[in-house]
């Protein structure tokens, strides 16, 4: 069995956020292939099916981003799987929009969802990073990742997600180079770009920045942001 874990924040108000591209990727795979309807288990939305002759579990943690590992780790333990059977799909600030990279293991790059997966699942899993671009100024990072994709983003976002879904069997078989070439052709990016420089964590990048407009003041998301960024200074 292979577990494909898309990372994001739950709730319709966050569905279009750049931070939720992992959820979007799993939704595209779910639409394209014959998976079961979404159901709730492991503090997540899950669906099961078969790709490339392999049983596949799609999982979208509903714990909010920085607790994603609790959900995914529970699923791995239930099915007696190791990190080698896990593929995480998530947003990457330090890749150009539409650019994709995949690797086995590595650091979290400041991504809070990946920090949580590392803590609960181990390090030796495959990581598919989907570029959302950097806003260019650390003070705008929080607003960028928690902001919605714009209409112009559809020019690369739709081909990226549809091509990933169409070739999800390559992801399951571990044909990573072939998949990266497919995605690069679909989005007009290069499959052999230089590796991005290590990024500071989202927390450090955004702590001294301007808070984005219309952030929730109550509820689970508000509590998560308070823990991440602390009280606003005068």
Swiss-Prot record:
Region called Disordered, residue ranges: 187-234
SUPFAM superfamilies (alphabetical): Peptidyl-tRNA hydrolase-like
Residue positions of the active site: 19 (proton acceptor)
Catalytic activity: an N-acyl-L-alpha-aminoacyl-tRNA + H2O = an N-acyl-L-amino acid + a tRNA + H(+)
EC number, as in UniProt: 3.1.1.29
Pfam families listed in its UniProt record: Pept_tRNA_hydro (PF01195)
UniProt cross-references to PANTHER family, sorted A to Z: PEPTIDYL-TRNA HYDROLASE
Name listed for the protein in its UniProt record: Peptidyl-tRNA hydrolase
Primary gene name: pth
């Amino acid at each position: 069995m292979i577990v494909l874990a898309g990372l994001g924040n739950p709730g319709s108000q966050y569905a279009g956020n750049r931070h939720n591209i992992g959820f979007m990727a799993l939704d595209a795979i779910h639409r394209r292939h014959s998976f079961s309807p979404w159901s709730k288990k492991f503090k997540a939305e899950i669906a099961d099916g078969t790709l490339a002759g392999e049983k596949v579990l799609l999982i979208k943690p509903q714990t909010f981003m920085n607790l994603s590992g609790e959900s995914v780790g529970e699923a791995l333990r239930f099915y007696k799987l190791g990190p080698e059977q896990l593929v995480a799909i998530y947003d990457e600030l330090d890749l150009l929009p539409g650019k994709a990279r995949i690797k086995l293991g590595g650091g979290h790059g400041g991504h809070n969802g990946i920090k949580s997966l590392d803590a609960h699942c181990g390090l030796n899993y495959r990581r598919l990073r989907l570029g959302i671009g950097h806003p260019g100024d650390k003070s705008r990072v929080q607003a960028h990742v928690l902001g919605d994709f714009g209409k112009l983003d559809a020019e690369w976002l739709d081909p990226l997600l549809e091509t990933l879904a169409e070739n999800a069997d390559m992801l399951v078989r571990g044909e990573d180079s072939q998949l990266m070439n497919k995605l690069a052709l679909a989005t007009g990016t290069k499959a052999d770009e230089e590796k991005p420089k290590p990024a500071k964590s989202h927390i450090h990048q955004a702590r001294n920045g301007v808070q984005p407009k219309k952030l929730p003041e109550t509820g689970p998301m508000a509590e998560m942001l308070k823990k991440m960024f602390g009280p606003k200074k005068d």
